[in-house]
Amino acid sequence: MEYKRPFGVKIDLETGVIPGAKRIVRKLSDMRGYFVDEEAYEKLLREDPVVYEVYAIEQEEREGDLNFATTVLYPGKVGKEFFFTKGHYHAKADRAEIYYALKGKGGMLLQTPEGEAEWIPMEPGTVVYVPPYWAHRTVNTGGEPFVFLAIYPADAGHDYGSIKEKGFSKIVIDEGGEVKIVDNPRWSV
């Protein structure tokens, strides 16, 4: 039998960068339809800021293997809504995931397909377990980049379409300097 070789990489804990990793950049223009305040979105779109970057170490999509990635989620807002990742279910919905906060301040918004939502605040050292069947999105509620590590099954896949179509049942906003979790006026089952 030929065994896969073990390896190690170093994560820059200050920047979140994994040297040599696959880099994905998500700009505001990649997130049309995700934010509630369309007028604020169009105004900020003129600058088209980078919302987040992902540095992924991916394996072959097969059962039993693991992928891992860091995400650098930048501070910012569209209207009152904090910058967030697109969010997704897993294509193989029965797959779980682990997130570990490295730097900054934010949280994880999770929901079931029926719209039951949970908010888990995150700061450096926080570990979040994402159970199977739960959609998940990270949100930067602070003033500096929010950096975290994600570890997930290599065959989990990503279902972004369900979130793009229906959104999350809750949104995370800045209400007078406080983080508030409120109903998404555009959400539908």
Curated annotation (Swiss-Prot):
Residues bound to Fe cation: 88, 90, 97, 136
InterPro entries cross-referenced by the UniProt entry: G6P_isomerase_archaea/bacteria, G6P_isomerase_prok, GPI/OXD, RmlC-like_jellyroll, RmlC_Cupin_sf
Location of the protein in the cell: Cytoplasm
Alphabetical keyword list: Cytoplasm, Gluconeogenesis, Glycolysis, Iron, Isomerase, Metal-binding
Any one of the GO BP annotations: gluconeogenesis
Gene3D superfamilies: Jelly Rolls
MF terms in GO: glucose-6-phosphate isomerase activity; iron ion binding
Record bears the keyword Isomerase: yes
Listed pathway(s): Carbohydrate degradation; glycolysis; D-glyceraldehyde 3-phosphate and glycerone phosphate from D-glucose: step 2/4
Domain of life of the source: Archaea
Main location: cytoplasm
Record carries keyword Cytoplasm: yes
Entry's EC annotation: 5.3.1.9
Membrane-crossing segments per the record: none
Catalytic activities: alpha-D-glucose 6-phosphate = beta-D-fructose 6-phosphate
Pfam families with a match to the protein in the record: GPI (PF06560)
Enzyme class: isomerase
One GO CC term, this protein: cytoplasm
Family per record: Belongs to the archaeal-type GPI family.
PANTHER family: CUPIN TYPE-2 DOMAIN-CONTAINING PROTEIN (PTHR35848:SF6), OXALATE-BINDING PROTEIN (PTHR35848)
Description of how the protein assembles with itself and partners: Homodimer.
Name assigned to this protein: Glucose-6-phosphate isomerase
Organism: Thermococcus gammatolerans (strain DSM 15229 / JCM 11827 / EJ3)
Gene coding for it: pgiA
